[in-house]
């Protein structure tokens, strides 16, 4: 089975009361129960069932997970990111909610997980793409958030976006902003966690389009000259981790605003190895330099506040390497920042 509903036990935490003034994520999330579909590919229908099914037409944020680290294994990384979705839910669960999220005016719907079984990454990505497209196409969805998983998640996010009513199907200009220490533009015989944006570029070229791709946080020592040359050839816009630090929050805000200004739809992907190792030790490749959390958060809030953010994924959390759940907590804060900004749910 490559898709499954989230168990209710995934959303538990401190309970201070039942009113909106006490609201936390675990009290607000509504778990979508689904019948198993015959097909798990992009065309397989994701069926919702049960007496208390969350209304897909209600104003909401859709959440889903992709339990996969086969792409990391193929990329010779340290596996464990398949456990990322569960750890991210645990980190999100106790966070306080405010405004329309606390009052239930904007809901949180958990659509469940897709999974890579064994070494069949491609089937897992197809299942995740179908679930992602379903999240995007739910009538009331303001934002779809994918909890990874290795950065192979980005390819399934792309397929989901292309299979949804957003982007090219709607005649919309779309682009992807990657917060990452790496370009992930590798050319490999098989897809890995290091190839998703090369795959996107090839797919866009085949469709007669150019990939609009920007990256914040590139670590020069972690990307070869060949990767920089490939990025230049594809017209990628990027800042290194050192440039991000020098530019500060204002500069990063301008970078994101300028990128989003040319788009109708924005897809944001956060590889947690963009953060310094002290903040995010729980990743396959911890960053010696990294982009400080406040600057990364500025990029996230600017993207979320653009009015164009439709899809967010957060990837590369490896709980087995995480110290004191630092990485999971930082990731949860960034997800919460994005959701609060999109929904206008400040305190």
Segments (PLM) and residue ranges:
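Conserved alpha-helical scaffold segments that buttress catalytic/binding sites
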Residues: 2-65, 70-347
